[in-house]
Amino acid sequence: MNRLYSIILLLVFICTHVHSQQAYFVDGYHGGIYGHYPVKWKTQFIVDQLSKHPDWRICLEIEPETWDTVQIQTPEAYRQLKNIVVSKQVEFTNPTYAQPYCYNISGESIIRQFQYGIAKINKHFPGVTFTTYSVEEPCFTSCLPQILKLFGFKYAVLKCPNTCWGGYTNAYGGELVNWVGPDGTPILTVPRYACEKLEENSTWQTTAWCNEESYLNACRDAGIEHPVGMCFQDAGWKNGPWLGSGKNIKSNSIYVTWKDYFENISIGKTNDEIGRA
């Protein structure tokens, strides 16, 4: 009887442990009319892929002026997209007008990037809100916590795992940190984890770019309860869900938006800090 009881307890522990180690992934697109956004087909492609894969979630980092051209050249796809972007499948995570790297321009210029970009996006998609700042390229600078909070953002992400050739943040912390600006303003942030190493034999990636088991195991060993990877695909690529779909999703990952991850999945708060001078 004691042996049977021990086996049952072991099975319960294993099931609980496996459940707590669910992997998550934030997919999306980045680009724009001046970089890479094939206007003739891209918007309809996004709409069709979201319809085909109802469990897919994406974050959009598209130069706001792009939508002026999309509205003119592919009006039907534009109309369909307007309905989808206010659904739980989509989150806009970088509304800056031209996706600046931020660390090489002044604070006033950064503010204008957000101001003009948000106004343009709201003109096209009035129901869109801006909750999380997340980028594919390393568009970070120390004053962002204050600026983001002033524009109504609640969260930030310091990962850029598939575009490290432009730069990358220091590896620090666990599931969440408070990113603190020079003025003392904090913003709840998903960092580049301390266990998130640079990818071997690559000059542009960290291990978080595709939810490999080695990355997820490192996260679990580091005590990260809800490990998450990300990749915002180039808008010029004709590719849907980055990790696959249905029963073929890599590492049994679940697609989420960053807003959903912060508010419904992550540990929600932390006392750990990064960035305070």
Per-range role (PLM):
Residues 4-16:
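Sec-dependent N-terminal signal peptides
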Residues 21-276:
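Catalytic-domain carbohydrate-binding cleft regions of carbohydrate-active enzymes
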Residues 1, 10, 276:
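Conserved S/T- and glycine-rich ATP-binding loop of Class I adenylate-forming
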